[in-house]
Amino acid sequence: MRSAPAIRACQRICRCLLSGFGGQVDGRQPEQLSKGTGSFVGPVRSQAELPRNEPREAPESGGEGSEPLVEICRKRRFLSGTKQQLSRDSLLNGCHPGLGPLGIELRKNLAAEWWSSVVVFREQVFPVDALHREPGPSLPVDNGFRLVSAETLREILQDKELSKEQLVAFLENLLNTSGKLRENLLHGALEHYVSYLDLVNKRLPFGLAQIGACFHPVSDTKQTPDGVKRIGEKTEASLVWFTSARTASQWLDFWLRHRLLWWRKFAMSPSNFSSGDCQDEAGRKGNRLYYNFPWGKEPIETLWNLGDHELLHMYPGSVAQVHGRDGRKNVVPSVLSINGDLDRGMLAYLYDSFQLTENSFTRKKDLHRKVLKLHPCLAPIKAALDVGRGPTVELRQVCQGLFNELLENGISVWPGYLETVQSSLEQLYSKYDEMSILFTVLITEATLENGLIQLRSRDTTMKEMMHISKVKDFLTKYISSAKNV
């Protein structure tokens, strides 16, 4: 039988192991380790670690989830979950149930714009892909999340023959030999550095870009008592830029300007995006980009000059293999890390686009039109097709033909004509405004007679008549011109 000190040691280690495993977003207690569980995650520290954002306090109340914007995002399927699950902090920390179909499309569009801006139109940036987990032994100070077999852990804990020292040794060995969930994308880029260095014939500068899910510990004493941490998840867009130390400061300034202008490009109120200096515990300097939410500024992207420390740590013993060419000189490059949180960025654009305007559909002055005026490039759905008065079968056939034509040309469409519940045009327009749909195309009996449709704009609420054959070209040019602004 184990001694009391051994039991207390087990409890401390298990509390550490269970961090991130059982924190439920709906406020339930952490789940117990059951026989049906295959693996779970415990915290350790990542080797290639970026300076962290400032820790956040848990929300004082859950009232933030009932605000008008979050309610619209739930109603129109940008976000999934209940009001209680969609508190301010759960959205910022990535501890909510997830995105709805429109939220998925919005984040996909945001990621596509980032990729085009950073990778596609730049000759010195290359895509890279890395595992969600980082293999290999961990360092003693490592406190990132570990992937541990629940069955293996159960066998160790249930072995009553083990002494305190043996139990601790087994558990530490289990942690040290298990893979860890990545907290950022830096480690993967550094792993691929040498192979890409050969690709560019060792010429500096160049960059490696990746978009992927990352995981981080979140403290919330209300949800998870006894110090057990929950797992927060975010979609990170990362550019790791390798340059000589001589030009590192200039490149950091360049990317700071580039990234700030990029965020502002898609905003209704560009001034809500700003930048500021920051510094980590080691004295390394960097910059943060912020969005000014109604409650205050929150970071959405960070830029760091990490020097050569991480690169030399990744490739110990052979400095020559990491040398790049700066003109005629062989140098160990400085590493610039530019990593943006696309989930926070998406939340920023939802707040930026949300407007309450006077409702022209009603004479009641206390009612307002709620509209999400997302940038045309980011809007999840560009057009909605609906039917007015006339023979239903024939009108739906026309809608189906136009639907297929628009999809074939890369224009996302909402098939409102398939709806079986009757709604007034005013109700349809309100619904589509809240879904941030740019244009509503109304197919009526007149379309069957002369080919004319009614086109209604989300931003102006103006309606105009247009021949159905011109709709595709009009939408294509509208979206294309918005990209170039």
Swiss-Prot record:
One of its GO terms (biological process) is mitochondrial DNA replication. SUPFAM superfamilies: Class II aaRS ABD-related, Class II aaRS and biotin synthetases. CDD domains: Pol_gamma_b_Cterm. GO terms for cellular component: cytoplasm; gamma DNA polymerase complex; mitochondrial nucleoid; mitochondrion. Residues 28-67 are annotated as: Disordered. GO terms for molecular function: DNA binding; DNA polymerase processivity factor activity. It is found in: Mitochondrion; Mitochondrion matrix, Mitochondrion nucleoid. The keyword Transit peptide applies. InterPro entries: aa-tRNA-synth_II/BPL/LPL (IPR045864), Anticodon-bd (IPR004154), Anticodon-bd_dom_sf (IPR036621), Gly-tRNA_synthase/POLG2 (IPR027031), POLG2_C (IPR042064). The keyword Ribonucleoprotein does not apply. Keywords: DNA replication, DNA-binding, Mitochondrion, Mitochondrion nucleoid, Transit peptide. PANTHER family: DNA POLYMERASE SUBUNIT GAMMA-2, MITOCHONDRIAL, GLYCYL-TRNA SYNTHETASE/DNA POLYMERASE SUBUNIT GAMMA-2. Accessory subunit of DNA polymerase gamma solely responsible for replication of mitochondrial DNA (mtDNA). Acts as an allosteric regulator of the holoenzyme activities. Enhances the polymerase activity and the processivity of POLG by increasing its interactions with the DNA template. Suppresses POLG exonucleolytic proofreading especially toward homopolymeric templates bearing mismatched termini. Binds to single-stranded DNA. Heterotrimer composed of a catalytic subunit and a homodimer of accessory subunits (POLG:POLG2). This is DNA polymerase subunit gamma-2. It comes from Bos taurus (Bovine).
